[in-house]
């Protein structure tokens, strides 16, 4: 299908590594002179930080110990779907920013833990780029996945995902190990029901697998490095993918299934550049013909 206003969505749980993938896309956009409009998934949370704490306390008092940022109740799924639909049809839409810390507060002019006002996406963009929790979400009321032309899943094995979240939340956000563990436990039902199913909707999944012991992520002192990892890359539709070329260009890579290639963790950026650049250029070419 020819789309005049293509959409790319990057989906992953908290601590999955979607921000690193976003940086690779930004490098490709810069090199290929692609102008992207950006949406951050946090912008479509329903509550700011103080409101979420209040709602969590209220739900806890009612006996609900699993009220989390992953669920439809705490996110603006209909509004997110609306922006995807609007951009796909007209190249326009509204978004905002969720301000996490003092540095972002200085940039956007609102206190940490709050949202900026809604504002229009930039004019004259080549495509829309979403990065967050729900870029391919499908429920009985919304279907965000249907509007994205290229859907990427970032899905480390679960223990590695937890290690990354623990380290990020402790070091960058000042939380204790106990607090992060409580968050992981509280989110688990919504993780199973609303995060995992998205990775059956994605076109490509990047799954990092550590080659060191991560049996107890809650006591791990270090995040396994790329040199201590392999990455499984699964393509939903491998038609048109030149696997022999990829195998020749990525040292020590191999195919584990007809639609899956395994690479050394240190070669992830190279693999993403080789796989994603042609797909992005295809979207731009179709845009020009639409």
Curated annotation (Swiss-Prot):
InterPro entries to which the protein is assigned, alphabetical: P-loop_NTPase, PRK, PRK/URK
PROSITE patterns: PHOSPHORIBULOKINASE
Pathway assigned in UniProt: Carbohydrate biosynthesis; Calvin cycle
Pfam families xrefs: PRK
EC number: 2.7.1.19
Keywords tagged on the record: ATP-binding, Calvin cycle, Kinase, Nucleotide-binding, Photosynthesis, Transferase
EC category name: transferase
Binding-site positions, ATP: 12-20
GO biological process, one term: reductive pentose-phosphate cycle
NCBIfam families: PRK15453.1
Family affiliation: Belongs to the phosphoribulokinase family.
Protein name: Phosphoribulokinase
Species in which this protein is naturally found: Nitrobacter vulgaris
Taxonomic lineage: Bacteria, Pseudomonadati, Pseudomonadota, Alphaproteobacteria, Hyphomicrobiales
């Amino acid at each position: 299908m020819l789309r005049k206003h293509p959409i790319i969505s990057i989906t992953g749980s908290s601590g999955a590594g979607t921000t690193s993938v976003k940086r690779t896309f930004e490098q490709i956009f810069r090199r290929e002179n692609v102008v992207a409009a950006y949406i951050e998934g946090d912008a479509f949370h329903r509550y700011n930080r103080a409101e979420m704490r209040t709602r969590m306390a209220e739900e806890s008092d009612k006996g609900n110990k699993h009220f989390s940022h992953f669920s439809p109740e705490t996110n603006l799924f209909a509004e997110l779907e609306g922006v995807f639909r609007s951009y796909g049809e007209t190249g326009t839409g509204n978004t905002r920013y969720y301000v996490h810390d003092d540095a972002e507060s200085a940039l956007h002019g609102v206190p940490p833990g709050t949202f900026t006002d809604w504002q229009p996406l930039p004019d004259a963009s080549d495509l829309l780029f979403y990065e967050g929790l729900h870029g391919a979400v499908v429920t009985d009321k919304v279907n965000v996945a249907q509007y994205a032309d290229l859907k990427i899943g970032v899905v480390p094995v679960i223990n590695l995902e937890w290690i990354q979240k623990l380290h990020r939340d402790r070091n960058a956000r000042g939380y204790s190990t106990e607090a992060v563990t409580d968050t992981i436990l509280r989110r688990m039902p919504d993780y199973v029901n609303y995060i995992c199913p998205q990775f059956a909707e994605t076109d490509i999944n990047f799954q990092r697998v550590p080659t060191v012991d991560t049996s107890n992520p809650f006591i791990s002192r270090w995040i396994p490095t790329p040199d201590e990892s392999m990455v499984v890359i699964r393509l939903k539709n491998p038609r048109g993918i030149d696997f022999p070329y990829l195998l020749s260009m990525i040292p020590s890579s191999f195919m584990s299934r007809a639609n899956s290639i395994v690479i050394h963790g240190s070669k992830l950026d190279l693999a993403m550049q080789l796989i994603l650049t042609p797909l992005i250029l295809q979207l731009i070419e179709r845009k020009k013909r639409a």
